[in-house]
Amino acid sequence: MCDEEVAALVVDNGSGMCKAGFAGDDAPRAVFPSIVGRPRHQGVMVGMGQKDSYVGDEAQSKRGILTLKYPIEHGIVTNWDDMEKIWHHTFYNELRVAPEEHPVLLTEAPLNPKANREKMTQIMFETFNTPAMYVAIQAVLSLYASGRTTGIVLDSGDGVTHTVPIYEGYALPHAILRLDLAGRDLTDYLMKILTERGYSFTTTAEREIVRDIKEKLCYVALDFEQEMATAASSSSLEKSYELPDGQVITVGNERFRCPEALFQPSFLGMESAGIHETTYNSIMKCDIDIRKDLYANNVLSGGSTMYPGIADRMQKEITALAPSTMKIKIIAPPERKYSVWIGGSILASLSTFQQMWISKQEYDESGPSIVHRKCF
């Protein structure tokens, strides 16, 4: 019997992108936007096979005629009907597997409400009839992917940013900090500052264009004030971008002003600490004996840590906050966009993990609350 039959499925449901594939693989097979789109207009062409909803890339490509909704906001599922559509799409259209034949490993945001984990568990067993499932915390998986069991993970995706200190494989819940500032907010901010340049982006479809500009052109300045001065005095930092209709726009200091909001949330009118300070605060909430290990293992994870220059800037900012003799190391793996998924793939293929799955039988005996006993 070939082991492909029983390979576990690993599904990392991010606020912006859904990553899915088979345990044991080194990268997800399917990566698509966590979007459900519904037509804004009446269908007039009979027999066109128009659907009442589109998911993922198809929704993205037809975005001009759709209203796009993200069922996961700030890392937490807010619309279960749409979430079910995304899972259905993942299993049947992307991976082309029958979920009732494979154990499924799902991921969740740290500090996820209890009711949410129960609902995920319920849908997996009752709607998709999976034989077994497990819910793992995203940041912990990122740490596994970097080959560590101790460290502090700064996980910043599209919907939420967390700093999660982990010691010997255990997340320390009292020291986890959450910042509701991530990729989507940066996209919105870039929309706003591009508007000041006279380019107007307003619809949900245009927001996706701005997201692309952000991903292709933005970077983090090592010294913000100095970079602003450089941008003001010369055009060396300007880049051009071609919009889908052929119009070319010029982007200047917006390139680093946009991600600067991660370090200075006041740019977005938020009163919270930046990612460097949040990381520091998280470390300071931990036991004094383990701080040294955390400072030396700062792991970056998630798509919003992909900006060029972010690791150097974090190094500089945390060095300024930490005790002067402390050794500080920022680990920024090149595949960190997918490190949660990769960690899930590693975890689900460990032989020692096989007794950790929640089986259908256990679910039938205990109900959805079993998830709190088995997954921690």
Curated annotation (Swiss-Prot):
It catalyses: ATP + H2O = ADP + phosphate + H(+). It comes from Onchocerca volvulus. One of its GO terms (cellular component) is cytoplasm. Keywords: Acetylation, ATP-binding, Cytoplasm, Cytoskeleton, Hydrolase, Nucleotide-binding. It comes from the Eukaryota. Gene3D superfamilies: 3.30.420.40, Actin, Chain A, domain 4 (3.90.640.10). Its main location: cytoplasm. The modification N-acetylaspartate is found at residue 3. Pfam families: Actin. This is Actin-2. One of its GO terms (molecular function) is ATP binding. Belongs to the actin family. Its EC number is 3.6.4.-. The keyword Cytoplasm applies. InterPro entries: Actin (IPR004000), Actin/actin-like_CS (IPR020902), Actin_CS (IPR004001), ATPase_NBD (IPR043129). The keyword Zinc does not apply. Residues 1-2 form a propeptide. CDD domains: ASKHA_NBD_actin.
